[in-house]
């Protein structure tokens, strides 16, 4: 069940939507109809929603969406001529995942621009989930309120989020908007198939991307996350453990009496890639050690 509604920051008219993406609005007189949320399944439709089915749609589903208060729906051109009994405005289009991602992002207020977005991937799901938790703890130690998106434990600051996995692009934008509204400075994503559907990160700007396998090249890491719609752009930093992060982590692990510093090293490498000063990291580690 996916709907962008709890954290909608913007509204959009059907006319603007159709003109922006080159879609066909029927009737054209519905151009000023304003949608207030987006839903990709019938169960998620609320009054004012735009129904954007994630799978093949039929007239029966459109009728259900209409009954539940949808203000419009995006449907394929193949349905033209079969919807005479549908009274809500229809937008005929075959939108790409990129277009849908931009639409959902715009409706949610582009939350990834208000957050430092960290993402961790790898071939071992359990390790990825562990790295996400460790990074969340480390960012919290540095004084950053954090949101986490992970099938094992999603939360916005201290608020646990009851979600159905894997998450769609609509879900991800909604959760990130919730985190931003709650005051999070950063959000951490677990890039695994249990957490995310394909293309779930369309139009999400990832600032720092890391992999639990330090032997992969940047190109291999980018290929690994492409199925989730995670585009590695010029602003994306791909982080991995370095001699510097290993040394800082080893020093901290010794102080704590721990034997494994690999996970802490990756967390340190990621926050260094995000622009946090080494002096600040050392200070936080020292304070944490003294408190413990």
Predicted regions and their residues:
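Phosphate-binding loop of NTP-binding sites
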Residues: 104-257, 264-274, 278, 282-292
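N-terminal leader/targeting and accessory segments in enzymes
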Residues: 1-102, 106, 250-261, 276-292
């Amino acid at each position: 069940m996916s709907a962008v509604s709890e954290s909608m920051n913007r509204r959009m008219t059907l006319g603007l939507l159709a003109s922006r993406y080159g879609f066909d609005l029927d009737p054209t007189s519905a151009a000023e109809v304003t949608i207030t949320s987006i839903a990709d399944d019938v169960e998620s439709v609320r009054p004012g929603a735009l129904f954007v089915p994630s799978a093949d749609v039929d007239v029966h589903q459109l009728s259900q969406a209409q009954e539940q208060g949808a203000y419009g729906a995006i449907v394929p051109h193949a349905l033209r001529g079969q919807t005479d009994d549908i009274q809500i405005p229809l937008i005929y289009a075959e939108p790409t995942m990129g277009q849908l991602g931009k639409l959902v992002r715009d409706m949610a207020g582009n939350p990834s621009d208000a957050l430092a977005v960290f993402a961790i991937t790898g071939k071992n799901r359990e390790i990825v989930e562990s790295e996400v938790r460790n990074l969340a703890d480390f960012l919290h130690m540095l004084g950053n309120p954090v949101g986490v998106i992970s099938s094992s434990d999603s939360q916005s600051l201290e608020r646990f989020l009851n979600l159905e996995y894997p998450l769609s692009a609509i879900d991800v934008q909604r959760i990130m908007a919730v985190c931003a509204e709650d005051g999070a400075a950063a959000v951490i994503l677990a890039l695994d198939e249990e957490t995310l559907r394909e293309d779930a990160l369309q139009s999400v700007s990832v600032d720092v991307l890391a992999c639990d396998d330090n032997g992969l090249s940047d190109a291999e890491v980018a290929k690994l996350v492409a199925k989730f719609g995670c585009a590695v752009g010029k602003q994306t930093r791909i982080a991995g453990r370095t001699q510097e992060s290993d040394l800082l982590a080893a020093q901290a692990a010794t102080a704590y009496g721990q034997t494994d510093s690999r996970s802490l090293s990756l967390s340190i490498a990621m926050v260094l890639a995000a622009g946090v000063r080494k002096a600040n990291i050392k200070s936080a580690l020292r304070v944490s050690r003294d408190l413990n």
